[in-house]
Amino acid sequence: MAFWLAQERRSQESGFIQRFDPRFWTVDFPRPAMASAVTIGPDAIRVDVELHHEGELVGLIWESVDRFDHALLAYATDRDYSHTSLSFRWRSEGVIALDQPNGPTLTIEGRDEAGVSHTWYVRLWNYAEGSPTDAHITLAFSNLESGYTLPGTPVTPTDIDRMFISIVAPGHSGGSTVPLAERVNGHVVMSDIETGGARSMLDVGDVRLPVHGLRMATAYDDAYNQTPARLLRNIIGLGYRSDIVHYVGMSHFMRLERLGDGTLLADPSGTLCEPARAWHEAFLEQAGENDLEVIPSLSFELFDAYCPQEWKQRDAAGAPAFTGWVPPSTLLSPANMQAMGWLAEVARNIVGMLRAAGLQVRFQIGEPWWWVTSAGEICLYDDAAITALGGDLPNIGDLRKALDPASLDLLDRAGDLLAASTAGLAATVRDAAQGPAEILLLAFTPTILDPSMPEVHRANLPSGWAWPAFERLQIEDYDWLIEGADALRREAFNFVDTKLGYSLVEQDYFAGFVLDAEDAEDFWPRIDRGIDEVSARGVERLYVWALPQVTRDGYTRLPSTGKSDMQSFDDVLYPFALGRSSAVAPEFSTSISVTASGHERRNALWSNARMHFDVGPGIRSETELAELIAFFRARHGPARGFRISDPFDHSSAGMTGVPTALDQLLGTGDGVRADFQLMKSYGPGPEQQVRPITRPRGDSLLVSVGGVQTGDWTLGPLGVISLGSAPAEGAEVRAGFLFDVPVRFAEDRIDIAGINFAAGEAPSIPLIELREAG
């Protein structure tokens, strides 16, 4: 399907927003503080904070450059705030008041009149009218002064990068890690936000792309700093509909409680921290208002610093399971009843919010597994797991090695334990729903079906997950997808189908994921192609993971328009053999310029020749002439393509020879890639022309890998060979074949005069080669 990576807005729809629109503020803060911002009206925003240490500071941020919205929806960059004013009503509770030392301050980062980086600190109380907790504030940027008291240092308003308002706890001490006497929960409401002056409005992208059938996935850990309204604006504007899979994350949603030694750990009650609760309530409510369902997702992953030691999965040496994130997260043991109880209570709280928002209860259990380290060690040796699995467990030191029966049995029992834990979580969700509930399970196949560890599926894709354990099974394989490991993907699809038994209509697919922006140009085409491939399998619910990468890279999906008549192709052969009287003409397009010295400069505009045929001279009788006219009418003239056999070039062996499996080099194995385009090379050396072959004769095709002919392949559309397994690194993939040329009639009519034909005059019936993706 068509897509592009939009880097800027050109002629797309745009509009205007008021500068300082509440939807576009963000928050940020250091761990373990928590904060969120939600819009509570067209001119109002509320910030909730949960603070644990004297030095923690939450910033409510406005940036001159839009770093978070998709290019087609972003607001314009404008660093000049001169002659602009911002006014609002400030109300606060539980946080330090406006009139106090360290009270709310507008920190402005930019450059002074000399262009030197500078930071100004504008005390809001100096511009407030009212009480320290309920005041009206007006900030005229051309007249602002930095400092605790006025007069102060004038602010240069013409080159500002960003500004933020500080929100801290009473008793704040900058940089201090001393715990507060008790957790501080507070909030700030900025309402009646109004911008005036000469630069009070910003140009903003305002596209509403056609609905394309894909759905969106996002995560609170990626979006905690943005307002729910901003996320939903991007999702809807980019054409995503139906529902959103929303991962509640592993680091920002939980309430933390302090132990006697000062350590902050996840509250075993499963309570969400107040900022996360407020954010999710707003997100669910606003999604429902936009006819979007939300599928919350909860995983077994938890930020390591917040996880009690006894909850963690561990390897045989007792080391905790650590993911690759920095700082790391860990995995909860399915055997630990406290850990599973915490997950269950979190789920119960989330379901309660779904019901309060009037949304259907749909809930994803995301990627539950026993962690496997990079050394192949499986982490099922925590104390609770050892007890649950019977004690005195065999040490599975490396899943990449052959395993004895006792180890295989242990993996099976670990799988049963994992299945029991997910069944328990599902039961909690169903109970909390107090009515119908749809439970979905997400499985990440590159890990649980890693071919270097062929038995790990026993533990991490247990038979206890087989249908109908869950209403829907969701598959994610982004490691393989972005690597181009198509054979592994296909094998995994088939394995999962066989083992778990979910029909294709009961399966969903997650496509992604571009971690680094520099990989966008390479990875998004593979992701988009993978979406189409899975759709062709019959999977209807397709999700893009995840929104931050979509907006960062400008991924823009367009709906399918169906087959255009002008692009249609009838896979039929031209009904007459081309005789020697037929004309065949390869054509290139070349730009030739002559310099003042008389020398030519030549530039080939096409990498491949385009073939022209004149088949009129091959018509030998009035019967054939009648057939030709019928064939022309059936193709609607040049509207529909068809095959033709080139009498002078139709084989991989030379031009017309008998094919062998070694004729044409398609590529070299890398241990990952399994799909190869049929090609034919012309000429020797590095300057040879390589011609994609999109219309091979399937019954003539021969394939070899590493010089050995193989039958383990399938022929896909447009001449793509899919091998059953990826060729080893360095192995040559070759093929031999006969092929036809895709063509169309070159003109809208054919002129044939019966008297001329009877007199032996051949008509002219030109054909032109079609360029097909290949």
Residue ranges, per PLM feature:
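Solvent-exposed edge beta-strands and adjacent loop segments
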Residues: 30-35, 39, 567-632, 740-761
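Extra-cytoplasmic beta-strand recognition segments
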Residues: 68-106, 139-141, 161-165, 193
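Extracellular beta-strand ligand-recognition surfaces/modules
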Residues: 86-88, 136-187, 193
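Substrate-binding cleft of secreted/luminal carbohydrate-active enzymes
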Residues: 161, 168-171, 240-253, 293, ...
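Catalytic domains of carbohydrate-active enzymes, especially glycoside hydrolases
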Residues: 213-215, 219-262, 282, 286, ...
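The substrate-binding groove and active-site-proximal loops of carbohydrate-active enzymes
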Residues: 216-222, 262-274, 327-343, 408-418, ...
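Polysaccharide-binding and catalytic clefts of secreted carbohydrate-active enzymes
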Residues: 321-432, 444-461
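Extended beta-strand solenoid/passenger and fiber regions
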Residues: 629-714, 737-774
